[in-house]
């Protein structure tokens, strides 16, 4: 038996024991999630097409891994305005293993972790509520749960990082939030530091290394 499901704005043809990499859905590793958007089910020549979904059909899947995809660089350039901008993006992804295809409103043989998960949007909706709940339990506001910066900003006046080609006001503000405020700090970045920045911020490794070399020249 096979099914055609829709999740994360994409369609997949699945069968039992198939492993898929899909856009993020809520669930811990090892839990069973139920995907309710089934466009079609079939076995052999007998195929049922939904309108748009097959009534009572769903797919139970086990969460194998939660992670992120490779970084994709978006480069924008405006001609005659000397404007260039690079942004990095890593898509949140979930690896699932199809456990079973269910018909006529049947329930999964294993306990489902939560309500039927259809896309990454549900996970995004749960994150703010979870942060507020944890903050309330600790007697703190949601803003106080913000992660610590990657680096410790030195005392004194910060440098104007926008002097470095490729660092605009927005990028300079993002670097400042992570404790990077001077040319000396950028010039002293190690490859390990650059890897940490690449993981946590929307900048590529090559981009940060270029800033490091420019900062060395400016800091002389």
Swiss-Prot record:
UniProt entry keywords in alphabetical sequence: Ribonucleoprotein, Ribosomal protein, RNA-binding, rRNA-binding
Segments of this protein annotated with the region Disordered: 109-158
InterPro entries the record matches: bL21-like, bL21-like_sf, DUF4332, Ribosomal_bL21
Pfam families (UniProt xref): DUF4332, Ribosomal_L21p
A GO term from the CC aspect: ribosome
GO molecular function: rRNA binding; structural constituent of ribosome
Segments crossing the lipid bilayer: none
Keyword Ribosomal protein appears in the UniProt entry: yes
Compositionally biased spans, kind Basic and acidic residues: 118-146
Gene Ontology biological process terms from the UniProt entry: translation
NCBIfam families: L21 (TIGR00061), PRK12278.1-4 (NF008916)
Subunit structure: Part of the 50S ribosomal subunit. Contacts protein L20.
Record HAMAP family: Ribosomal_bL21
Record function comment: This protein binds to 23S rRNA in the presence of protein L20.
Protein name, as recorded: Large ribosomal subunit protein bL21
Organism expressing this protein natively: Chelativorans sp. (strain BNC1)
Designated gene of the protein: rplU
């Amino acid at each position: 038996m096979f099914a055609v499901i829709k999740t994360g704005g994409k369609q997949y043809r699945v069968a039992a024991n198939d492993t898929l990499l899909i856009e993020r859905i809520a669930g811990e590793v090892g839990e069973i999630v139920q995907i309710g958007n089934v466009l079609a089910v079939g076995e052999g020549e007998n195929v049922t097409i939904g309108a748009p979904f097959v009534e009572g059909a769903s797919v139970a899947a086990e969460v194998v891994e939660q992670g992120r995809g490779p970084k994709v660089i978006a480069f924008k350039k405006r001609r005659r305005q000397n404007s260039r901008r690079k942004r990095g993006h890593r898509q949140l992804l979930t690896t699932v293993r199809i456990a079973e295809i269910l018909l006529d409103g049947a329930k999964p043989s294993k306990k489902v972790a939560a309500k039927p998960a259809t896309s990454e949007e549900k996970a995004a909706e749960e994150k703010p509520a979870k942060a507020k709940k944890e903050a309330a339990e600790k007697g703190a506001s949601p803003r106080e749960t913000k992660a610590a910066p990657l680096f410790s900003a030195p005392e004194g006046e910060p440098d104007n990082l926008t002097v470095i080609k490729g660092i605009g006001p927005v990028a300079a503000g993002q670097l400042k939030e992570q404790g990077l405020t001077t040319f000396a700090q950028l010039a002293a970045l190690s490859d390990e530091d650059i890897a940490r920045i690449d993981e946590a911020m929307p900048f590529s490794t090559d981009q940060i290394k270029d800033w490091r070399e420019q900062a060395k020249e400016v800091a002389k």
